[in-house]
């Protein structure tokens, strides 16, 4: 049997998302899949959907509070940071100064990617000398990196929570003629991110399998709607992308 999907976008607003979920409840959907706008604001969504007795599945961003019976389909965000940190430790022979470009501090992905990178590089003997929030935006990555460069501190690597901020950092380093001395890593393996890996400006990125998360979310929702059981967490693994294995990620 086929699945009828109704998809809406929340325009990055939690209040809009809650209203959309309430509309889905009123429409008596068989299951609801939510990619939360902010991971700290899922309480009202969870209460409303569970109160209506409708199966709920969260995808991509893990809610801060994940109650029993509500599965999460996504990737282990801390592991993304650990992959970045492991790559940098090896590339820098376990010595040097690292700065971290963080996404949105209200999101679990920001906290976990940052923690994964920081713990991994520090364990290897590198120093994290600063971290700043760049709201996932390229222009913020650029302006924060400019400020770091102006500070005169020695920076050997920039660990960015996503490719967009990493690309901004690369622009700032290119403008200052310092890209050759600094390794930049990102997360997402976006089209632009992959192009930068190919060009040799982005040392590495981390592939997040959005298609795998989406299909996993639908599979879980269908199973729950049919009275089946689903694991609490369905992990779709992150993968490190470098110049060596870039070809296998094209078009994924």
Regions of interest found by a model, annotated:
Residues 1-252:
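A residue-level marker of the well-folded mature domains of exported/periplasmic proteins
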């Amino acid at each position: 049997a086929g699945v009828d999907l109704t998809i809406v976008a929340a325009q990055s607003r939690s209040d809009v998302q809650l209203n959309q979920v309430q509309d889905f409840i009123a429409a008596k959907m068989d299951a609801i899949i939510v990619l939360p706008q902010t991971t700290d604001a899922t309480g009202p969504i969870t209460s409303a959907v569970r109160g209506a007795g409708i199966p709920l599945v969260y995808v991509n961003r893990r809610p801060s509070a994940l109650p029993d019976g509500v599965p999460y389909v996504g990737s282990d965000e801390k592991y993304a940071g650990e992959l970045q940190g492991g790559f940098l430790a090896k590339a820098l022979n376990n010595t040097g100064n690292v700065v971290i470009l963080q996404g949105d501090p209200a999101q679990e992905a920001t906290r976990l990617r940052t923690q994964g990178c920081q713990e991994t590089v520090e364990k290897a003997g590198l120093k994290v000398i600063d971290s700043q929030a760049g709201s996932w935006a390229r222009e913020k990555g650029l302006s924060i990196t400019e400020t770091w460069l102006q500070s005169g501190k020695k920076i050997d690597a920039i660990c960015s929570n996503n490719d967009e901020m990493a690309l901004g950092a690369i622009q700032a380093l290119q403008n200052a003629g310092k890209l050759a001395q600094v390794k930049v890593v990102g997360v997402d393996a976006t089209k632009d991110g992959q192009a930068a890996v190919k060009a040799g400006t982005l040392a590495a990125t981390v592939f997040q399998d959005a298609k795998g998360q989406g299909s996993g979310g639908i599979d879980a929702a269908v199973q729950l709607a049919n009275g089946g059981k689903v694991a609490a967490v369905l992990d779709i693994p992150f993968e490190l992308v470098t110049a060596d294995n870039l070809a296998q990620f094209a078009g994924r």
